[in-house]
């Protein structure tokens, strides 16, 4: 995939690395659901769940529904092109400030608008923003980009 600087999110995450953008996870979930239907796996799960060693299969329907939700989680545009949440406070803030991304803001290290990223991305966005600020967008695109990084405790 060509590295496109228009896919660098305001927050420092690279939209091109997102499972919703690449479609890999949604496609795998779709294909698994199709195979499960073909094999009538619901019947197997129902039967095997009656045994103590198969008790986890009691949640088969819930698992199947989660796979369905994963199929729908797609974003082909990236946040700069109309993808992502229309209510993203990070994007709104950067646009109001007239800046290309949070790496141009002196407050990104302590910005509370970023906190909602932590459960899914850890501190990857901060490390990415530091890298973009230090090396520039082109070097960031050619180097190691983080999607998740465990925050130091």
Segments from the language model and where they lie:
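Cysteine-centered metal-binding/redox modules
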Residues: 1-153
């Amino acid at each position: 995939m060509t590295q496109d600087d228009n896919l660098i999110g305001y927050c420092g995450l690279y939209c091109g690395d997102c499972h919703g953008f690449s479609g890999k996870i949604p496609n795998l979930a779709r294909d698994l659901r199709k195979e499960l239907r073909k094999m009538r796996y619901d019947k197997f799960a129902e039967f095997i769940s009656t045994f103590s060693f198969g008790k986890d299969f009691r949640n088969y329907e819930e698992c199947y529904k989660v796979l369905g939700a994963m199929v729908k989680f797609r974003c082909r545009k990236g946040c700069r092109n109309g993808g992502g949440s229309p209510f993203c406070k990070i994007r709104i803030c950067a646009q109001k400030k007239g800046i290309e991304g949070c790496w141009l803001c002196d407050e990104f290290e302590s910005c509370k608008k970023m906190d909602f990223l932590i459960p899914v991305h850890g501190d990857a966005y901060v490390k990415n923003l530091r890298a973009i600020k230090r090396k520039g967008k082109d070097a960031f695109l050619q180097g190691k980009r983080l999607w998740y990084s465990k925050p130091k405790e």
